């Protein structure tokens, strides 16, 4: 039974998140329905991580074992045909070793958070970005972000319902770049706590607005207390863009 690695993009807006839910639409559920329609038997699809409701992906990775040999391009096309009209697309399918695990084989996960920093309303990107009307000091945000790089106890920046055994994570990258009215936060790490990226982004926005200094951000991290976190950024600006193996 061959194992296939799938690279997937999706608009998270209509979904309750990646994880299968019995009564709610999920990305995992849409993919498993497409696989069953393609191969004729129920098949579990395992993702590299569970994105929250409203979070998007341009490079999510999953694997599944299919009881039928498909040429990878034929499987990709068949899955895409059965995925319609869901806003989910399989970009690539490839046969991999049966030891490959989308979640546990991952070495690094890359996320992008998109902010549009302008007073005018959004006309074209509603549900795709976070509009912040107050002018943000992106240089101050970037400088403060470097205080979070490295291995830390990120309790302040994790959801109270996070089920991770340890609050310690190693953050490899957290950059803030501006291009016109677009402010983008780029982050990479092997793994994250629940809501960690959105919590860090929201706190950095407070820095950009002048509500916090870099020292305030560092103090929030050191507090190891969820109550010390700034605002949590909304899900619509967050994208899982790549997973390294």
UniProtKB/Swiss-Prot annotation:
Substrate binds at residue 111. Disulfide bonds: none annotated. Signal peptide: none annotated. GO terms for molecular function: RNA binding; tRNA pseudouridine(38-40) synthase activity. Its EC number is 5.4.99.12. One of its GO terms (biological process) is tRNA pseudouridine synthesis. SUPFAM superfamilies: Pseudouridine synthase. Keywords: Isomerase, tRNA processing. It catalyses: uridine(38/39/40) in tRNA = pseudouridine(38/39/40) in tRNA. The active site is at 52 (nucleophile). It holds the Pfam family PseudoU_synth_1. It comes from the Bacteria. Belongs to the tRNA pseudouridine synthase TruA family. Formation of pseudouridine at positions 38, 39 and 40 in the anticodon stem and loop of transfer RNAs. Homodimer. PANTHER family: PSEUDOURIDYLATE SYNTHASE, TRNA PSEUDOURIDINE SYNTHASE-LIKE 1. This is tRNA pseudouridine synthase A.
């Amino acid at each position: 039974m061959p194992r296939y690695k799938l690279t997937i993009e999706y608009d998270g807006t209509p979904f309750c998140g990646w994880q299968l839910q019995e009564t709610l639409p999920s990305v995992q559920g849409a993919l498993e329905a497409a696989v069953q329609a393609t191969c004729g038997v129920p098949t579990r699809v395992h993702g590299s991580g569970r994105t929250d409701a409203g979070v998007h992906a341009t490079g999510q990775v999953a694997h599944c074992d299919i009881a039928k040999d498909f040429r990878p391009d034929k499987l990709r096309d068949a899955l895409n045909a059965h995925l319609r009209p869901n806003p989910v697309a399989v970009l690539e399918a490839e046969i991999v070793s049966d030891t490959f695990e989308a979640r546990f084989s991952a070495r690094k996960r890359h996320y992008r958070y998109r902010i549009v920093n302008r007073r005018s309303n959004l006309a074209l990107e509603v549900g795709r970005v976070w509009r912040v009307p107050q002018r943000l000091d992106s240089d101050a945000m970037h400088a403060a972000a470097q205080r979070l790089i490295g291995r830390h106890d990120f309790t302040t920046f994790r959801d109270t319902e996070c089920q991770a055994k340890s609050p310690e994570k190693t953050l490899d990258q957290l950059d803030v770049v501006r291009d016109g009215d677009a402010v983008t936060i780029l982050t990479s790490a092997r793994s994250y706590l629940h809501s960690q990226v959105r919590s860090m982004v929201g706190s950095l926005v407070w820095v950009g607005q002048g509500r916090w200094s870099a020292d305030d951000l560092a103090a929030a991290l050191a507090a190891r207390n969820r109550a010390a976190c700034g605002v949590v950024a909304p899900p619509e600006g967050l994208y899982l863009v790549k997973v390294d193996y």
